[in-house]
Amino acid sequence: MTNIRKTNPLLKIINSSFVDLPAPSSLSSWWNFGSLLGVCLGVQILTGLFLAIHYTSDTATAFNSVTHICRDVNYGWLLRYLHANGASMFFICLYLHVGRGLYYGSYTYSETWNIGILLLFAVMATAFMGYVLP
């Protein structure tokens, strides 16, 4: 008796895409962190842009603009929450992504590894200049 997911034309498409995916057997949940980094970065950029629309950098009114965002802007509190916690999630995913590369020996591909290290240093420098120094 054949399996219905392999004989039905509609289920066959879904089966070949999701169930019997042609992927290596060494794929594990550790390999999701690259795409999670992309999602976190996208959320950071979008929430940062929307927060920057309402933020005032003048020293006399900066705190008032933050309270304005939280109280008067629709879901402004959520934007601020997502932006603050998204940065932490981004760095957690980044360090786990590098840790996965160390565990699986990706450092042997020196060109790719060196580009990744340069990106890591650039992200850390940007976070330091943008969030720690001001």
Swiss-Prot record:
Any one biological process term the GO annotation gives: mitochondrial electron transport, ubiquinol to cytochrome c
Co-factor remark: Binds 2 heme b groups non-covalently.
GO molecular function: metal ion binding; ubiquinol-cytochrome-c reductase activity
Gene Ontology CC terms, in alphabetical order: mitochondrial inner membrane
Main localization (coarse): mitochondrion
Cofactor or coenzyme needed: heme b
Protein keywords: Electron transport, Heme, Iron, Membrane, Metal-binding, Mitochondrion, Mitochondrion inner membrane, Respiratory chain, Transmembrane, Transmembrane helix, Transport, Ubiquinone
Entry binding sites for heme b b562: 83
Mode of membrane association: Multi-pass membrane protein
Subcellular location field: Mitochondrion inner membrane
Alphabetized PROSITE patterns for the sequence: CYTB_NTER
Transmembrane intervals: 33-53, 77-98, 113-133
Record: residues binding heme b b566: 97
Gene3D superfamilies assigned to the protein according to its UniProt record, in alphabetical order: Cytochrome Bc1 Complex, Chain C
Note: Heme 1 (or BL or b562) is low-potential and absorbs at about 562 nm, and heme 2 (or BH or b566) is high-potential and absorbs at about 566 nm.
Homology family: Belongs to the cytochrome b family.
Function description: Component of the ubiquinol-cytochrome c reductase complex (complex III or cytochrome b-c1 complex) that is part of the mitochondrial respiratory chain. The b-c1 complex mediates electron transfer from ubiquinol to cytochrome c. Contributes to the generation of a proton gradient across the mitochondrial membrane that is then used for ATP synthesis.
Quaternary structure and partners: The cytochrome bc1 complex contains 11 subunits: 3 respiratory subunits (MT-CYB, CYC1 and UQCRFS1), 2 core proteins (UQCRC1 and UQCRC2) and 6 low-molecular weight proteins (UQCRH/QCR6, UQCRB/QCR7, UQCRQ/QCR8, UQCR10/QCR9, UQCR11/QCR10 and a cleavage product of UQCRFS1). This cytochrome bc1 complex then forms a dimer.
Protein name: Cytochrome b
